C-alpha cells in the first residue's frame, strides 16, 4: 500500500496516504456490493448508504433497488462531492437520490422521500445507546432548525482549510453527510457501519469553535476506523476501562478512539490559536481541555491496552504527539 501503509500507523495526515487508504477502502465496499450494483460506471466515491448496505445480510439490505439508485447517482460525483446536510423528521427535508437534503430549501416538500434506511438505522443505534447509558427509556431525537449550525460548520470548515489544510482535505474525502439531531445531552457521533456520516447534536455546532472541534472529533473517528480497516491496533479491544471522554466505562478500542480524536482536536485548535491571535478565547479553552483529557486517556490506556505490532507503532506516535503538544502549550 506504499504511503497508505505508513498512514495506517500515523496519528497525523498526509494527502497521499489518506487518498491511498480511501481508494482501497472504497474498492472493498464496491467488491462487497458487486451482486447488487447496476451495470455501467461504478460510484466515484463512497457514501454511508453504500457502506451500510455492504455490511447488511444479505448484501444490499432490504432495498437493493435503492442501493442501485444511489450507486448510479454517485457515478459522476467525483472523489469529493459537496457535503450534504440531513435533518431526519424535518418537514423541510428535500431529499435527493443519496437520501440527503439541502436544508436551505424552504419550499413545500410534503411529498419528499422518507429518511434513508441507513440514517434511520444509525439514529436508532444512537438512541439505544443513550437510553442504555442514561436510563431514560423514553429519550428521543427531535428535528432541530439546523440553519445556524450549518453556518457555524461551514465557517469552521473554512477555518480548517486555512489553519490545517491536510485535515480539511481528509474531512472532504471521508465525510459525505452531516445528520443534525436534537436530544438531551447528545453531542456528536460516528458509526462504523454508516462510515461517511457524522451525527451532530445542536450543542456541537452552537459556535464556530464548537463546530471546528466537532469536525476534527468526528473526522478523527472516521480516520481511525479507516486505519483499523487495514490493521487492528489492540488485541483486547473489548476490555472495559474508564477514560475522560465518556462518563461510563467503555471498551479499550473506544479509548483508543478517544485518544486519537483528542490528539487531533488539541492539535487543530493549537494551530488555529497560533495562526489567528485574535481567535475567540473559546479556542484556547477547548484546546486546553482536549490536551488535559488526552493525557488522562493515555494514562488509562498505558497499563491496559495490549497492542499489535502496528498498534504499538501507532501508540508511540500518539505519545510523541502528546509530548510535543504539551511542550508547545507550556512554552
Question: Where are each of the predicted segments found?
Answer:
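Post-HExxH zinc-binding segment in Zn-dependent metallohydrolases
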Residues: 239-278
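Long, charge-rich alpha-helical interaction segments
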Residues: 250, 267-275, 282-298
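Extended, composition-driven regions rather than compact fold-specific motifs
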Residues: 191-193, 198, 254, 259-266, ...
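Long, acidic, intrinsically disordered low-complexity segments
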Residues: 151-156, 192-226, 322-331
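N-terminal low-structure segments adjacent to metalloprotease catalytic domains
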Residues: 1-129
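Auxiliary, metal-adjacent structural segments of Zn-dependent hydrolase domains
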Residues: 130-194, 204-205
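Post-HEXXH active-site segment of zinc metalloproteases
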Residues: 191, 205-214, 222-253
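Pan-zinc metallopeptidase signature
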Residues: 284-331
Amino acid at each position: 500500500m506504499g504511503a497508505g501503509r505508513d498512514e495506517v500507523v500515523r496519528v497525523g495526515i498526509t494527502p497521499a496516504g489518506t487518498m491511498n487508504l480511501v481508494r482501497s477502502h472504497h474498492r472493498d465496499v464496491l467488491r462487497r456490493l458487486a451482486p447488487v450494483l447496476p451495470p455501467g460506471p461504478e460510484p466515484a466515491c463512497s457514501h454511508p448508504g453504500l457502506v451500510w448496505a455492504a455490511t447488511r445480510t444479505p448484501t444490499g439490505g432490504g432495498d437493493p433497488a435503492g442501493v442501485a439508485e444511489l450507486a448510479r447517482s454517485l457515478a459522476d460525483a467525483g472523489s469529493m462531492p459537496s457535503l450534504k446536510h440531513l435533518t431526519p423528521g424535518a418537514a423541510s427535508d428535500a431529499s435527493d437520490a443519496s437520501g440527503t437534503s439541502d436544508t436551505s430549501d424552504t419550499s413545500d416538500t410534503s411529498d419528499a422521500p422518507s429518511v434513508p434506511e441507513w440514517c434511520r438505522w444509525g439514529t436508532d443505534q444512537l438512541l439505544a445507546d443513550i437510553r442504555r447509558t442514561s436510563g431514560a427509556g423514553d429519550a428521543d431525537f427531535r428535528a432541530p432548525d439546523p440553519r445556524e449550525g450549518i453556518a457555524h460548520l461551514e465557517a469552521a470548515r473554512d477555518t480548517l482549510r486555512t489553519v490545517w489544510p491536510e485535515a480539511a482535505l481528509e474531512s472532504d474525502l471521508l465525510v459525505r453527510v452531516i445528520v443534525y439531531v436534537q436530544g438531551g445531552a447528545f453531542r456528536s457521533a460516528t458509526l462504523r457501519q454508516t462510515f461517511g456520516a457524522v451525527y451532530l447534536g445542536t450543542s456541537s455546532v452552537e459556535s464556530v469553535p464548537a463546530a471546528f472541534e466537532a469536525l476534527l472529533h468526528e473526522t478523527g473517528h472516521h480516520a481511525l476506523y479507516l486505519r483499523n480497516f487495514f490493521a487492528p491496533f489492540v488485541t483486547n479491544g473489548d476490555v472495559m476501562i474508564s477514560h475522560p471522554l465518556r462518563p461510563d466505562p467503555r471498551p479499550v478500542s473506544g479509548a483508543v478512539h478517544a485518544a486519537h480524536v483528542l490528539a487531533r482536536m488539541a492539535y487543530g485548535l493549537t494551530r488555529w490559536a497560533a495562526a489567528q491571535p485574535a481567535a475567540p478565547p473559546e479556542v484556547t479553552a477547548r484546546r486546553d481541555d482536549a490536551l488535559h483529557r488526552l493525557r488522562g486517556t493515555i494514562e488509562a490506556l498505558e497499563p491496559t491496552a495490549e497492542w499489535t505490532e502496528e498498534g504499538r507503532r501507532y501508540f508511540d506516535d500518539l505519545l510523541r504527539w502528546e509530548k510535543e503538544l504539551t511542550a508547545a502549550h507550556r512554552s
